[in-house]
A protein has these predicted regions:
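Generic N-terminal amphipathic, Lys/Arg-enriched alpha-helix
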Residues: 1-22
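Well-ordered beta-strand positions
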Residues: 108, 140, 157-158
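A short, well-structured juxtamembrane/interface segment
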Residues: 22-40
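Glycine/threonine-rich flexible loop motifs
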Residues: 117-127
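Gly/Ser/Thr-rich loops at beta-strand to alpha-helix junctions
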Residues: 49-54, 116-118, 149
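Glycine-rich, small/polar surface segments that engage phosphate groups of diverse ligands
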Residues: 35-108
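Short alpha-helices
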Residues: 136, 145-198, 202
Length: 202
């Protein structure tokens, strides 16, 4: 990579490299799983922390409104999230939320995460606990994650890994491509049932 590049040029070049390198196969598997989930009346639960939590709330809106899937994110309910964190601890906050939501085999858990969770390193242990429960219940596990994908990639049914092209920009690219991929999904002809406003004004 040229040392004469500006930061903006380098960042956008990295984004292009990621686009060229990303594996499409797990994304197409997500489409099939989500179509089957909707047909079966299943629900979709988005889990993430930090910037990924913000993406979860946005994705919930899109999957409900555009795709017609009943979707939720525990991080959208600040009162319950903080009560569980205060009373029970951060590590179990998502798994207990899924238990209260009566997670079923017809449902799916969708992870947005930079690292995918790693119990040994004590990174996003709350995601790992939630995924352990999801697998026990028999729910599908989807994800868009960075780095090596962590625990999410190891147990997931369809997990897109955002390739690392620069170790110093893993987080911004991982979170940006979460949005790229979920917008691809809600725009996919197998999933999209509601036209978005600006595309309907031609």
């Amino acid at each position: 990579m040229s040392g004469n590049m500006t930061f903006s040029e380098r960042h956008l070049q990295e984004a292009r490299q990621i686009l060229d390198a990303i594996d499409i196969a797990p994304i197409d598997r997500m489409v099939s799983i989500l179509a089957e989930l909707r047909d079966a009346g299943g629900r979709l639960f988005f889990l993430g922390v930090g910037g990924s939590a913000g993406n979860c709330g946005h994705a919930v809106n899109d999957f409900r409104k555009i795709v017609g899937i009943e979707a939720y994110a525990p991080t959208d309910n600040v009162s319950e999230l903080t009560a569980r964190t205060n009373d029970e601890g951060w590590e179990t906050v998502f798994v207990e939320w899924l238990k209260t939501s009566r997670l079923k085999p017809t449902d799916a858990v969708f992870i947005f995460s930079v690292g995918g969770g790693d119990m040994k390193k004590n990174v996003s242990a709350n995601l790992v606990r939630a995924l352990e429960y999801a697998k026990k219940v028999g729910a599908k596990v989807l994800g868009v994650v960075g780095r090596d994908g962590g625990y999410t990639a190891r147990v997931g049914d369809a997990v897109a890994i955002v390739p690392t092209v620069n170790p110093e920009t893993v987080t911004p690219h991982s979170e940006a491509f979460q949005a790229v991929i979920w917008h691809l999904l809600v725009s996919h002809p197998r999933l999209k049932i509601q036209q978005t406003k600006w595309e309907s004004t031609h």
